[in-house]
Amino acid sequence: LSSAASDVYKRQLYKNLDGKYLTLADCLEENKEKHENKIFYVTDEKEQSQYINMFKEAGIDAVILPNPIDSPFMQHVEQKNEGLKFLRIDADVNETFKETEETDEAAKEQEKKDAETLAEVFKKAIGNDKLNVKVEKLKNEGLASMITVSEESRRMQDMMKMYSMYGGGSDMFPAEETLVINANNGLVKYVLANKDGEKTPMLCEQLYDLAKLAHGSLSPERMTKFIARSSEIMKEEYGA
């Protein structure tokens, strides 16, 4: 390839969350203060709407890359630019979303114990002791839970999906999902204060399913249970 052809990525335009078209250099320059050498991207604006709203509220930008061919293109751009990393908008909890406050050692130790307790309660309620659970103190107190999938795991999944088109198995390497629990949320605080409560398991399942639903990855079986559970919660709330 000629140098002009191999450097075509430099002239590639990326559509951002505001509908503006930017070059790679523009994307990196506009966001270097908040996430240097990282470009967040969206593959499905409807499915990832919760994450998009979080990014907009925090003043963080992302680009829209909805096509299957975008994945190998991103890898090509990363190879051409040392240190550059593309991360899907739901790959991790950005530091900007986290509450930043200095605490003493005693408080940190208590937070660690609370996080371990919450993880155990959620795993037991959901019935999955292998579930990855991370507890964070997020600025948005209204958000109780969310699902993240590491970029490495997602790319492996994408590769397996392409492989399955030629007779391979797409479920050989399941995505490494993490349930992120917001310690600042009122419902999560309730779970922590009532870890052995009668209604706590139902609440944990509801928060997990809501996170999966927002992530667009709720299975038909869990969807059926979620609808039934939601109906039961409303009956209890209104005495029906």
Identify what each model region corresponds to.
Residues Y41, I60-P66:
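Short hydrophobic alpha-helical runs that function as membrane-insertion/retention elements
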Residues D7, C204-A211:
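Short alpha-helical scaffolding segments that buttress acidic/His motifs in well-ordered protein cores
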Residues D70-E141:
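Conserved phosphate-handling catalytic cores of large alpha/beta enzymes
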Residues E36-K38, T43:
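Long, structured protein-protein interaction/assembly regions in large complexes
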Residues L1-A5, Y9:
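Single conserved hydrophobic/aromatic residue that forms the stacking wall/gate
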Residues G216-A240:
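Long, highly charged low-complexity segments enriched in Glu/Asp and Lys/Arg with interspersed Ser/Thr
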Residues T117-L192:
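Charge-patterned, long linear interaction tracts outside catalytic cores
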Residues E29, E47-D61, Q79-N81, K161-G167, ...:
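Short, solvent-exposed amphipathic alpha-helical segments in soluble enzyme
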